[in-house]
Amino acid sequence: MKLSRLILQIVISATAISNLSAADVIAAASDAPDTTLVFNTTWKGERIQLPPPFAPAMKLKGTEEIRFAPGMFDAGSALFFSYAFVFSVSKDQALTGDIIQMEILAYYRGLSESILKRKNVNADADKFTFKLQQAKEATGTPEKVAASAKAVQYHGELKWTEPFVTAKPQVLYFEIQSWADPATSRNYLFVCTSPKPRGDADATWMELRNIRRSFEVKGSSGK
């Protein structure tokens, strides 16, 4: 199945639950601020609304830009379920460690429940856990982000049920950076995740960090 169709099906399925039309959701996903989130990679992806219809428990409002590794939905691939995404939210929405922990957990609980419900599988999402710890310093930050932005880095571990391919328990590891951008008057959360434990010499994590390092935001002050 093509990736764009997969994402659209997730959105449409969750939309039916929230009594919105698919057209409304698609329009909302494209209603982004006058900024461009630039990923210098060949990885493909999508832009969707925050909160996404499949995770109505989330409180953050804005946009999410995603880039999926080749092999993202191939359980036999070395890049299975490895990807990067960015949350872009207005400057009045703080991205503290506590908020990040709650929002990421709500995101993945909703995602798993939405997909597994279509497969008649109980996600048991209340048992999902997401541990988050702030790192001593932020390393490999986006080179186009001003040093004055003072990015904060976190390491995380999610225990959940992977819903797309295996419908089995999975552990995802996270490397997250957040910063405020005065040029666009927005806060950003850059997330790298993979079922592979984080490692300096791991090829998957090296690529994820390269994508983050080359990421940039273009545009003027948004909403």
Q: What is the meaning of each model-derived region?
A:
Residues 1-5:
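Positively charged n-region of N-terminal signal peptides that target proteins for export
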Residues 9-19:
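Bacterial N-terminal signal peptides
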Residues 22-27, 223:
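Low-complexity, Gly/Pro
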Residues 50, 100-107, 204-207, 211:
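Stable alpha-helical elements in mature extracytoplasmic
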Residues 55, 109-116, 216-220:
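Sec-exported extracytoplasmic/periplasmic mature domains
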Residues 71-162:
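Conserved polar/disulfide-associated segments of primarily extracytoplasmic proteins
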